[in-house]
């Protein structure tokens, strides 16, 4: 198996991927993005790199013998005027700015194009860990009740529509009312906003109501930016009074699956995977 270069942003996903590769005996190195990557990744071979340091990243990947790369983790859209790119990054910067004006997906595709031009193959996180995506059906012991089905349906519709508009990947619906949609703030911040809403229009621990739906954008570069949930998502959804989470089977990453199942079961939330081509 070819050596993997993990381009690591923030969050738990890069940490789990590194642990998986280590346990599976797959050779890998980690390119740790400054200000984003988890400090626990420092123990692995690789390099600390900045977002605009394309030359340093390519040099480090080749020095480590990597010919396949996987992008994982959260990275905020940069302030291009404040970037400090290296010489290689300076050549790429104008095209990145143009792509960014077209949306996040166009920006990601432009970054991938640059890596592929350098001869690196792109491998998605779900390809590195095949068992990482949400399966079809219930994940854990809790099932949605009949009264949740309409919210599941509408939340998925809203999530898919904002994805079509390249706005975000998530939406929260409670008893037919759209409580929130995700944009640049991300899912965690969206759920915090829901938790701050009056209990009269959302659920609570004693009577859970409402659904978080996450869905990829129709034109999304799935090798890089599949929607993701983890243990923190479960806890924030619970604090917001939600009844559960729904996503498209095979198109939602579940980070630390066993811990997600345990947290959802303990808090009484359902996690449901639906066929991307069907309504639940």
Curated annotation (Swiss-Prot):
EC number: 3.6.1.54
Name of this chain's protein: UDP-2,3-diacylglucosamine pyrophosphatase LpxI
Cofactor section: Mg(2+)
GO cellular-component term (any): plasma membrane
Effect of residue 182 to A: Loss of catalytic activity
Amino-acid positions noted as binding substrate in the UniProt annotation, renumbered to this chain: 12, 74-75, 169, 187-188, 214, 226-233
Note: LpxI generates the same products from the same substrate than LpxH but by a different hydrolytic mechanism. LpxH and LpxI share no sequence similarity and show a different taxonomic distribution.
Record text on cofactor binding: To a lesser extent, can also use Mn(2+) or Co(2+).
PANTHER family found in the cross-reference section: BLL4848 PROTEIN, LPXI FAMILY PROTEIN
Topology of this chain in the membrane: Peripheral membrane protein
Record GO biological process: lipid A biosynthetic process
Note on domains (UniProt): Consists of two domains: an N-terminal lipid X binding domain (LXD) attached by a flexible linker to a C-terminal catalytic domain (ICD). Binding of UDP-2,3-diacylglucosamine by LpxI induces a conformational switch that brings the catalytic domain close to the lipid-binding domain for specific recognition of the substrate and catalysis.
Quaternary organization: Homodimer.
Superkingdom of the source species: Bacteria
Effect of mutating residue 193 to A: Wild-type level of catalytic activity
Entries under InterPro entries matching the protein: LpxI (IPR053174), LpxI_C (IPR010415), LpxI_C_sf (IPR043167), LpxI_N (IPR041255)
Result after altering residue 185 to A: Highly reduced catalytic activity
Keyword Phosphoprotein: no
Keywords: Cell inner membrane, Cell membrane, Hydrolase, Lipid A biosynthesis, Lipid biosynthesis, Lipid metabolism, Magnesium, Membrane
UniProt KW Lipid biosynthesis keyword: yes
Activity: how regulated: Inhibited by high concentrations of Cu(2+) and Zn(2+). Completely inhibited by EDTA in vitro.
Role of this protein: Hydrolyzes the pyrophosphate bond of UDP-2,3-diacylglucosamine to form 2,3-diacylglucosamine 1-phosphate (lipid X) and UMP by catalyzing the attack of water at the beta-P atom. Involved in the biosynthesis of lipid A, a phosphorylated glycolipid that anchors the lipopolysaccharide to the outer membrane of the cell. Can functionally complement lpxH deficiency in E.coli. Cannot use CDP-diacylglycerol as substrate.
Originating species: Caulobacter vibrioides (strain ATCC 19089 / CIP 103742 / CB 15)
Pathway the protein contributes to: Glycolipid biosynthesis; lipid IV(A) biosynthesis; lipid IV(A) from (3R)-3-hydroxytetradecanoyl-[acyl-carrier-protein] and UDP-N-acetyl-alpha-D-glucosamine: step 4/6
Broad EC category: hydrolase
């Amino acid at each position: 198996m070819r050596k993997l270069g993990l381009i690591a942003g923030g969050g738990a996903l890069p940490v789990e991927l590194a642990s998986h590769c280590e346990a599976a005996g797959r050779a890998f190195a980690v390119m740790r993005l400054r200000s984003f990557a988890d400090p626990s990744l420092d123990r692995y071979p690789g390099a600390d790199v900045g977002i605009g340091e394309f030359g340093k990243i390519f040099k480090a990947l080749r020095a480590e013998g990597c010919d396949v790369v996987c992008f994982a983790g959260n990275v905020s859209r940069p302030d291009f005027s404040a970037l400090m790119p290296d010489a290689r990054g300076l050549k790429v910067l104008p095209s990145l700015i143009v792509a960014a004006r077209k949306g996040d997906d166009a920006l990601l595709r432009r970054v991938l194009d640059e890596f592929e031009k350098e001869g690196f193959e792109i491998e998605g996180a779900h390809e590195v860990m095949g068992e990482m995506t949400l399966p079809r059906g219930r994940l854990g012991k809790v099932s949605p009740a009949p009264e949740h089905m309409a919210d599941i349906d509408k939340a998925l519709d809203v999530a898919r529509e904002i994805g079509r508009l390249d706005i975000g990947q998530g939406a929260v619906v409670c008893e037919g009312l759209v409580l929130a949609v995700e944009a640049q703030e991300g899912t965690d911040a969206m759920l915090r906003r829901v938790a701050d809403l009056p209990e009269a229009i959302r659920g609570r621990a004693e009577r859970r109501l409402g659904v978080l739906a996450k869905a990829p954008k129709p034109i999304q570069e799935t090798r890089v930016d599949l929607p993701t949930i983890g243990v923190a998502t479960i806890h924030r959804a619970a604090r917001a009074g939600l009844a559960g989470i729904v996503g498209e089977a095979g198109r939602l990453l579940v980070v630390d699956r066993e811990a997600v199942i345990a947290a959802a079961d303990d808090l009484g939330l359902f996690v449901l995977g639906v066929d991307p081509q069907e309504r639940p």
